[in-house]
């Protein structure tokens, strides 16, 4: 197990604690569509407040080019206060004298939320001076943002040079469950990988092909494999110039007795009509077809594989679930995984690739799976074995 410096070993009474969370939540028409990342941060925030800390919460939000009211964390503070049943004060900056004055006025147990870190370009540049200014606000730094820990940013990586650093409860949970899943002790193990671009997942696919018993492919990634196997995919989305990568994955899978599973039948959109799915066998796809979901035979095959497995890792949707006509594959496989998890027959770890949205579409929740990772790119980096600057700096 990774040795994580736990916040439970520290005295926080009357200490200024800088807590890095990930409040990069989806917002539509001013309303938060999915508060999962906020909910995951609550245990750490509550623990620190109850321990008498002055809790200074920092996060990024979106990808602003400059200060933008639509990407202000002011949009989050009301929800955070409601979920904590406690007033959270918002400060519309994250460094400088106004922020320092607000912190000086805090009592133990108070919570403030600072403005979007990415309003300063120095955040993404991992700038030492910006990190030093953030660090000057506090006595202790806590990273509770696994989903950002693959990034070498000032508030994730550089800041740990200036403050004693600890891991929050959300980060600890992520590490525990992901490490448990990729230890590959409970076999057979199955991985489902979907999504659009295979090039962003090549290292993960090769690593999985070395370790898992079944590698189930969905989305445009499956289209690339079908094309590689000389199957006509019509007008379906695929990525050019990746045949060498596909060859490496297939070769790795063959060497390690990993079975790669691609669709046998699919639902397609005809003439770009996304309102209705037409069922096709793989060998019967027409030139104008766009593959957008798996068919019933493929669903049956995948369900059988999962039922025979002990561990499941899932990254990315199987179909274009945003269109109701093509959501069935993702939704039904989610339900199979959920049922087996509830029966105690399967350890299921899901993350990245719009997984939270897909889970909501299926009418399911956190409790229906062993663990749902908040990480997108971080989940990919972890499964790929990449170095994660935020973890290295926090855990060193």
From Swiss-Prot:
It is found in: Cytoplasm. One of its GO terms (molecular function) is phosphoglycerate kinase activity. ATP binds at residues 201, 322, 352-355. PANTHER family: PHOSPHOGLYCERATE KINASE, PHOSPHOGLYCERATE KINASE 1, CHLOROPLASTIC-RELATED. It comes from Wolbachia pipientis subsp. Culex pipiens (strain wPip). One of its GO terms (biological process) is gluconeogenesis. This is Phosphoglycerate kinase. Pfam families: PGK. InterPro entries: Phosphoglycerate_kinase (IPR001576), Phosphoglycerate_kinase_CS (IPR015911), Phosphoglycerate_kinase_N (IPR015824), Phosphoglycerate_kinase_sf (IPR036043).
